[in-house]
């Protein structure tokens, strides 16, 4: 039974109350009980509006379902459908042209294009690794990944392999040729680097293997250095707004094998990182929410630490310090040692038992997230922490899963109330709008208008957006297979539309226009071939699954000047509303029994592999092996798309409930085997009826049509609490 404190018209779980009163509030100047009083007032004033918006979602969905059912068996009439959506209020007027006016935005968001990490904030090690992924070793990323083949004696092995090391150095040299080309020759031919004076500014000089000397093709590419001018230990380069270090040490195990003594090339990598309270996190009660907020506190005050065992040694992880150099102009130069951190709060749907209102009802979780994470951000805004996160005096909150401009307006109103409660200046709280719901996509310009003074981020997300696409049009007919979605008309239009509308609304120089996640952290060669498409599409950030991926993806932002791409794209609209409203239906399904079973196997295995860790162990994001044992980074978005596709096929008779249950049981055995090495794992196949996780997975599919917008949170939260009560974990 949760112990609660009555304060401010609320009933607050004891552990959360203590966290605020004893750990968060004292240094901020905010009275702890006054904080809860403000929250109570916000809940009373805005709670009903929150519920109205959710009711509106349901009413719109019911109307769309009814429209499709009335035309069942008829060819889809796109023109009539569009008119219906306008009359329904689903499609809203775009309104006049405008430009965002957001101010006090850090350059990492407003000016610099680069990789973005997203990590579950309740995992301290992941959070610290992400915050510290601002800088990453290119040598390590290349040596340990599949970017370089392991043939011709270049195996990774268990200890350093000089043959592989040579290939790493050659690849890194080619990267330097793109980042900071020499006036003559290549970095791979350099045998010594040094610095010379040039009218009061240092200039890089390189001696080549033929004895000739050269400099950078663009001398301004040298930003700074460390060490002696005739024997530097670090050369700091700058290109497309990103920095790269050449680290030199001829005595080093690696450096001694390089002609110029280069022991590493360090990339400025994850310029920004989203600390996630949402889709990658399993936080279902006061205990879980308290852990989430405590880690955010540790990131803001600089005290977060964790330890891990590596090679028989205990390693302490903490936030990295800033990096100091001598600037090329001779003055001291300091660069941030950490990624600029944003935080993703939950959306408008869920409520939380961590705090109850005066009537004993759970309060909206998004309102609680906003208040507590903003209170904690005062450590940064008031300079109370060990390091600064925002140097512009802003806090960056990403809001997910909003449906249309009214819901964005509600979030903006909430932010204003939070600022008033915490004594912040207006528009201190900036907003990132995830474009991952269909009603937001088709009304994106109107959504941005509602947040035009706060907007710092929009992005696309294939997985959630496809889940909503399928749920919205559930009654329209059977959907195409999951793999075919990526080449569908609506999806390509969605990706272009997001960039074009963002540029049209003046986000350039003020906000990020982002692209989605590469979900295969072990397949870096594939990422290097494919993900350059994101900067080429005009996105100034894109999601990566690991610090290694961030280091490698950073290369793409040297190969592509995103600012120039955005210049070319400005003023265009490459997609139309008609494209966006194209429903991804299979009008005449002719799949073979084998193809149908293949789709069932693939999706059931993925659902079970993710849900079993979520429900039984509270792991909201992890590398889950797929049916071919390829590790995929899974979160609730991947679960949403898989469960909604199967729910759609079941509803339209492509498969039967018996087929799904047979597949679920067979795939549970596969997942059990894949997790056999995990001592904390509870097998599902030993007792299907008794496995809470197995039952949760089945419920998500068999009752997928009933889930609000196809979301998985209601089932997952209820089942996770059931598992905690049953197993005590």
Curated annotation (Swiss-Prot):
Alphabetized UniProt keyword annotations: Cytoplasm, Glyoxylate bypass, Magnesium, Metal-binding, Oxidation, Transferase, Tricarboxylic acid cycle
Biological processes annotated in GO: glyoxylate catabolic process; glyoxylate cycle; tricarboxylic acid cycle
Record gene name: glcB
Principal localisation: cytoplasm
Assembly mode: Monomer.
Cofactor: Mg(2+)
Protein name: Malate synthase G
Catalytic reactions of this protein: glyoxylate + acetyl-CoA + H2O = (S)-malate + CoA + H(+)
Residues annotated for Mg(2+) binding in this entry: 436, 464
Organism for this UniProt entry: Alkalilimnicola ehrlichii (strain ATCC BAA-1101 / DSM 17681 / MLHE-1)
Entry EC no(s): 2.3.3.9
Record NCBIfam families: malate_syn_G (TIGR01345), PRK02999.1 (NF002825)
């Amino acid at each position: 039974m949760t112990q609660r404190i009555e304060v401010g018209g609320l009933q607050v779980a004891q552990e959360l109350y203590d966290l605020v009163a004893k750990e968060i509030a004292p240094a901020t100047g905010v009275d702890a009980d006054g904080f809860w009083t403000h929250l109570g007032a916000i809940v009373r004033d805005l709670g009903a509006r929150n519920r109205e918006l959710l009711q509106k979602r349901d009413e719109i969905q019911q109307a769309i379902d009814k429209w499709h059912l009335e035309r069942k068996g008829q060819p889809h009439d796109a023109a009539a459908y569009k008119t219906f959506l306008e009359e329904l209020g689903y499609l809203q007027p775009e309104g006049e042209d405008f430009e965002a006016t957001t101010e006090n935005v850090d350059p990492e968001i407003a000016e610099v294009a680069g990789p973005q990490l997203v990590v579950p904030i309740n995992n301290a090690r992941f959070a610290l690794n992400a915050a510290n992924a601002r800088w990453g070793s290119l040598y390590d990323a290349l040596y340990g990944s599949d970017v370089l083949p392991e043939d011709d004696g270049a195996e990774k092995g268990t200890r350093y392999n000089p043959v592989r090391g040579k290939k790493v150095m050659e690849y890194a040299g080619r990267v330097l040729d793109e980042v900071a080309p020499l006036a003559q020759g290549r970095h791979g031919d350099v045998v010594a680097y040094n610095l010379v004076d040039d009218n009061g500014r240092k200039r890089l000089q390189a001696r080549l293997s033929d004895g000739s000397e050269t400099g950078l093709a663009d001398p301004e590419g040298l930003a700074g250095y460390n060490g002696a001018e005739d024997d530097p230990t670090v050369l700091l380069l700058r290109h497309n707004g990103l920095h790269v270090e050449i680290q030199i040490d001829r005595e080093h195990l690696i450096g001694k094998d390089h002609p110029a003594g280069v022991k590493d090339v360090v990339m400025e990598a994850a310029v920004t990182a989203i600390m996630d309270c949402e889709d990658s996190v399993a936080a279902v009660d006061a205990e879980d929410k308290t852990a989430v907020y405590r880690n955010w506190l540790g990131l803001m005050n600089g005290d977060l630490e964790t330890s891990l065992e590596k090679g028989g040694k205990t390693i302490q992880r903490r936030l990295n310090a800033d990096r100091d150099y001598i600037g090329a102009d001779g003055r001291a130069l300091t660069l941030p040692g950490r990624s600029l951190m944003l935080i993703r709060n939950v959306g408008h749907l869920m409520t939380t038992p961590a705090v109850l209102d005066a009537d004993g009802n759970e309060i909206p979780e998004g309102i609680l997230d906003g208040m507590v994470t903003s209170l904690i951000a005062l450590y940064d805004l008031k300079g109370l922490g060990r390091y600064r996160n925002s140097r512009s005096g802003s806090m960056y909150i990403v809001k997910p899963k909003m449906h249309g401009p009214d819901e964005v307006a509600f979030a903006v109103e909430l932010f204003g109330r939070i600022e008033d409660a915490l004594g912040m200046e207006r528009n201190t709280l900036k907003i990132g709008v995830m474009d991952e719901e269909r009603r937001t996509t088709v009304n994106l310009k109107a959504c941005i208008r509602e947040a035009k003074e706060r907007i710092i981020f929009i992005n696309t997300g294939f997985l959630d957006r496809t889940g909503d696409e399928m749920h919205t049009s559930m009654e329209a007919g059977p959907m195409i297979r999951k793999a075919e979605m990526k080449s569908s008309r609506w999806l390509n239009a969605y990706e272009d539309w997001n960039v074009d509308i963002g540029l049209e609304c003046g986000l350039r120089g003020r906000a990020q226009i982002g692209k989605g996640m590469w979900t295969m952290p072990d397949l870096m060669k594939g990422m290097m071939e494919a993900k350059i498409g994101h900067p080429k599409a005009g996105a100034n950030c894109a999601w990566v699954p690991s610090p290694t991926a961030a280091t490698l993806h950073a290369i793409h932002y040297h190969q592509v000047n995103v600012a120039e791409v955005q210049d070319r794209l400005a003023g265009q609209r490459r997609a139309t509303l008609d494209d966006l409203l194209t429903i991804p239906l299979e009008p005449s399904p002719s799949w073979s029994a084998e193809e149908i079973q293949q789709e069932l196997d693939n999706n059931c295995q993925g659902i079970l592999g993710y849900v079993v860790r979520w429900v039984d162990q509270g792991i909201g994001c992890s590398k889950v092996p797929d049916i071919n044992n390829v590790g995929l980074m899974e979160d609730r978005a991947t679960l949403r798309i898989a469960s909604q596709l199967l729910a759609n096929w079941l509803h339209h008779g492509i498969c039967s409930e018996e087929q799904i249950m047979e597949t679920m049981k067979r795939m549970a055995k596969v997942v059990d085997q894949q997790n056999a090495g995990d001592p904390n794992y509870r097998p599902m196949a030993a007792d299907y009826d008794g496995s809470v996780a197995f039952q949760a997975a089945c419920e998500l599919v068999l009752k997928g049509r009933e889930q609000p917008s196809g979301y998985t949170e209601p089932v997952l939260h209820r089942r996770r609490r059931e598992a905690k009560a049953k197993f005590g974990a």
